[in-house]
Amino acid sequence: MGAYASLSAVDLGVMTVKELLRRANIDPQSEVIDEVVFGQVLQAGVGQNPARQVALGAGLPVSTPCTTVNKVCGSSLKAAMMAANSVRAGEYKAIIAGGMESMTNAPQLLLGQRKGTKMGDSTLVDSMIHDGLWDVYNDVHMGTTGETIAKECGIDRETMDAFAARSQHRAAEAWENGWFDWETFAVDVPQRRGDPVRIEKDEGVRPGTTAESLGNLRPVFDKDGSVTAGNASTLNDGASAVLIAEASFATSQGWEIIATIEDYCTSGVEPERVMSAPIPAVNTLLSRNGLDVLDVDVYEHNEAFASASCAVAQEIGIPEDRFNLHGGAVSLGHPLGASGTRCLITMLGAMRRTNAASGIVTLCLGGGNAVAMYVRRPE
């Protein structure tokens, strides 16, 4: 219920794609864009093919193919993978990939009512939790899996709170120094009365957060556990998008090549161990590309829970000074379908700032999968 509460997921997606087109100096009707692939998880009530709604809302031609992806938290990074596949196969030359989510506007569901209820009460089901945050295999909230990885990898409460505080500090520093400016844009939100309200920054960043203050919060999912509202990601509305193109075509259009996509993969583990799924995903990319963990300059992991980020860094051996340099979902938020390309873009921003040559981004996703992508900046 933040500043974007009055905007739908499609509204957010449309604004984001319009801004991408503006920055790339693309006339929407020029037919330069071959396809739009967009992720969204909470699609109930949104209408047919939300990606198509975004494309037409942004002014792209009716001839533009559009695909909506639901791979839970990995949706938009999977959209980027699918776009890369099409470009590599020679099918298309330029694709917009991204994702969107309005967790605020996810509806309450009245399941089973098409057949009717003869007697007794009916119960509303929160589609945000039911479709986005619930492990259907073990019938538990995803927060429980944050507790599972903490126990499995020996991540204590103090370590989690210290990581969460660092995420807040790094995000605040990035905003203060303008490091997010290249990847964000201001949004004017219409009001019922008066002028629109301009939103220029993430609402969840809290610069004054300390590990000590976080230590005062009670566990949420297990009374004897360690996952709290302060060391977990937040519920958010947002959208993100990238332009994926064949290199020579990008050059011919005058587009800056920010990075090249070298490799990507999806891994799988037991659903209850979902938070550990990025570990084999990242290790697969390292092995397949003949890399040691220290051969990669920057890593970006979606901070669904601080316990998960701590475990991923610990088990792979990623140094603190290469991991989530501008903060992550604990501070910036986690609008499910938008987070994949948001993480990719944030990592690219950190790579630009530090002049890093390479990076790996990864996200876990409900059901026991994880997605990961390896990129390099042009020399």
Question: What function would you assign to each model-found segment?
Answer:
Residues 106-143, 206-228, 233, 379:
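Glycine-/small-residue-rich "gating" segment that lines the acyl/pantetheine channel
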Residues 5-15, 23-26, 159-252, 315, ...:
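N-terminal extracellular/periplasmic Venus flytrap/periplasmic-binding protein-like
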Residues 69-101, 144, 150-179, 241-248, ...:
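Active-site-proximal alpha-helical scaffold in enzymes
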Residues 10-25, 50-51, 79, 142-149, ...:
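Short, well-ordered amphipathic alpha-helical segments that serve as non-catalytic structural scaffolds
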Residues 1-7, 124, 151, 210-276, ...:
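Condensing-enzyme catalytic core mediating Claisen C-C bond formation in acyl metabolism
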Residues 5-74, 78-95, 100-118, 127, ...:
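Conserved beta-ketoacyl condensing-enzyme motif
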Residues 145-147, 183-185, 191, 262-331:
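Active-site pocket-lining segment
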Residues 7-8, 40-95, 137-141, 208-234, ...:
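Conserved catalytic cysteine-centered active-site region
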